Amino acid sequence: MHTVLITGAGRGIGLATTRAFLGAGWRVLALDRDFSSFDAKAPGGQGALEQIRFDLTNTAGIAALSGSLGEVNTLVNNAGVLYCDPYEAIPEAHKREILAVNLEAPVALISALAPQMVARAQGRIVNIGSVAAFTGHPDLWYGITKAGILNLTKSWAAQLGRHGVLVNAVAPGPTHTDMYEQLPQSRKDMVSRSVYSGRAARPAEVAEAILWLGTASPEYVNGTTLDCNNGSYPR
């Protein structure tokens, strides 16, 4: 049975991705710091689930954690933090948390798990970016970190591609998650006007794209960002 590590698995896109991999028969290592709303039932799936409670702001502890996981075939760097702070009044603690969870933790996880993937000449890494990487996003540090995620996707693909490891990203548009629900109604109305279907994505729709890149996409799809934004940023 293949194993996937999914960060931010407790809710939203991470929870939907957990269900998708379980439904495909995978062993899922679901990592989050809060499982209070976690329900990962996947009808008909033959997968296995293990919960890992870990705070990704503890970037210094990631190497030891990764060493305890055993073989990981696919890594999904999904965990993310967003605060709706005005740019002129961003608390330093919020900035540090966003940088740690959204950018530093994915780098640390890839650094820790890539050697075993290289040794097997097989592995897949899927980083979750955002349409915020391409736009002038009102949540300043969130946009910065998501742009960084897409850059590091290409950088790691260039380093690992010759060793049989695929590194790709998914850049979702507005998606019905806890983060989305934090937005003011004016932002939600803007979202409805910006997408072709007039609605935010369902987490399960984004999870389907992640599952494909994490399990079945062609080997020549590498260093690529898959847009999943329904026209909110056509390019």
Predicted regions: what they are:
Residues G161, L166, V221-G223:
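Short, small/polar-rich loop/turn modules that mediate ligand/substrate recognition or access, typified
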Residues P86-Y87, P91-L99, Y180, V191:
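Substrate-binding pocket helix/loop in short-chain dehydrogenase/reductase
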Residues S130:
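Residue(s) in the substrate-gating loop at a strand-loop-helix junction
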Residues I90, G136-I144, S155:
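Active-site loop-to-helix junction immediately N-terminal to the catalytic Tyr of the SDR YXXXK motif
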Residues N222-R235:
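Short C-terminal tail/terminal secondary-structure segment
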Residues P115, A158-Q159:
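Alpha-helical segment proximal to the catalytic Tyr-Lys
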Residues I110, T145, T153:
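Active-site helix of classical SDR
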